[in-house]
Amino acid sequence: MNRGDLRLVVGLGNPGNRYANTRHNVGFMALERLASREGGGFRSMPKLQGQLADLGSGDKRLRLLMPQTFMNDSGRSIRAALDWFGFELHQLLVLVDDMDLPLGRLRLRARGSAGGHNGLKSTIQHLGTQDFARLRIGIGAPGQNPSERKARTVSHVLGSFSRDEEPLLDKVLLEVVDGLERIQLQGLDLAGNHLNGLQLAPTSTEE
């Protein structure tokens, strides 16, 4: 993805108030933060099976999509949006939560496997390729060993961020929103050099 290519940013998540503040919905959170900052609003688009916001105009218009299909069928909405707008894969970026990264870390990649994430699995299935950009947003993993992690995965990703995590989450969302602008202005490689090197930490309140 070169600078100026980005046209569609998709945040992965689950629809409904029940899931609104869960770790699995951090992609939705980032898009809502960006739309709020830019004065945009989401509207229902049944033909895309999602909610859509438009930012900017003309050649600089950026569309934000939150699939309403539930996580495991996200690819259906993404495929519909690409077809409806006539976008190519190099114009797409997917925002996704990642348990393999701690909260405070980001990883921008031009392509890759699903890594066990059902939303990415669905996207790869419906697009027929792994060759699309994705920004993985760390949410941390439950437990210290594989068996504990496996047992607690569902409750972790469908659980809300704790009050202690919220200040760091706020910093992460700000970096993601700023990172989208970096991608537009600099392209994927240069933006990735910055985003992939971040190691955000909560602001200390100690005197």
UniProtKB/Swiss-Prot annotation:
Family, per entry: Belongs to the PTH family.
Residues at the site labelled Stabilizes the basic form of H active site to accept a proton: D97
Any Pfam family matching the protein: Pept_tRNA_hydro
Keywords: Cytoplasm, Hydrolase, RNA-binding, tRNA-binding
Single GO MF annotation: tRNA binding
GO biological process: protein quality control for misfolded or incompletely synthesized proteins; rescue of stalled ribosome
Active-site annotation: H24 (proton acceptor)
E.C. designation(s): 3.1.1.29
Keyword Transmembrane helix found: no
Function noted in UniProt: Hydrolyzes ribosome-free peptidyl-tRNAs (with 1 or more amino acids incorporated), which drop off the ribosome during protein synthesis, or as a result of ribosome stalling.
UniProt entry tagged with the keyword Cytoplasm: yes
Subcellular location: Cytoplasm
UniProt cross-references to HAMAP family, sorted A to Z: Pept_tRNA_hydro_bact (MF_00083)
The protein's name in its UniProt record: Peptidyl-tRNA hydrolase
Gene giving rise to this polypeptide: pth
Subunit relationships: Monomer.
Binding site for tRNA: Y19, F70, N72, N118
A GO CC term assigned to this protein in UniProt: cytoplasm
